[in-house]
Amino acid sequence: MSRTLTTPVAIWSDLQISAIMASHMIDSGRLTENDLALVAALQIAPRASWAVVARATKTSPVTAARRWRRLVDSGAAWVTGAPGMSVWNAHCVAYIDIRCSPGQSLAVAAALAQDRHALSVELTAGGSDLFVTVAAADLSALSRYVLERIDVIPGITNTQTRISTHLYRDGSQWRLGALSHEGASEMQVPLLSPEKAHPIVLSHLQVSDREILVQLGLDGRSPYATLAASAQVSEATARRRVARLLGSGAVLMRTEVAAHLAGWQVPVVLSVDAPTNRLVETVRGIAGLPQVRLCATLAGTPPIVVQAWLHHVEALHDFETTLIKAVPNLTVVDRLITLRTVKRMGRLLDEDGRAIGAVPMDVWTDPLTVA
């Protein structure tokens, strides 16, 4: 099934208009407390009804829906459906540090951002110019993507690819913490979970399941009618498939926010070392920290990658101190500070971190074909 990818150039003028219309909800470059509470509620249950969200945020369903529409239209927040950690762990995921010729980093990032297999693309300061998260169906497909696509992009001078052996935490588990305890309790809605005891084996994902997953990646709150049309199934079937995908953990919904608008100004990437016999203990300790958005073990040296959001640059050393206190046996080997996120889990972002488009995370396809 062919798709037209939405690019920043194609939609920029429309997004500017939407951003102007929605500008009243942002005060001095920050989201309001009501906006943050709404995003926080949807982080807990991204596909919850507006009635449930309204109870949690002490507003009306109409007001909650209208506020969310403004956030989405301005690119300040969005919901993405992504393969769950069990699916990523069954696939082949890698983290690539890229060095570029002077003046070429932006062009390389823009080229990679249009690729379905490049899930996230970040311009960084430190030992690398770019930090890229990629995924493919298997090691063979990943090898083709790295060797026959990434390595031949003009402007790249060096790459270091580290393959993930296990993902312990991802962005779907990160929380703003902007909702009251009472409100958070309201959002603990059941996930239609009879399927939870029966995880989906990767090879059992049908083509229609993948089409639904791809559509959820474009808009995690897509109506069932839209999901049904994308998968060419009935609406009732789409409902059952979504319940199965969510209940089994094959799909995780993640409510995202433009980081700086929420006060998280500094994304960082840390390379962490730990004794092999204490690797699992270490990553579990790291994954429990509230700043952490990603924690994975790697087939490489050092064997752990950590991504976190911080409020300011000076907080980096405090965060490292917190890491060492939580897990004394670790050593931070390297640090990258993200200068600009060009793409986050399929979503194209502008220089201010606002969503301006999306590329389907159709990682099952041949990485060298053009959509």
Put a short name on every predicted segment.
Residues 3-371:
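A compositional/biophysical signature of low hydrophobicity enriched in polar/charged and small residues
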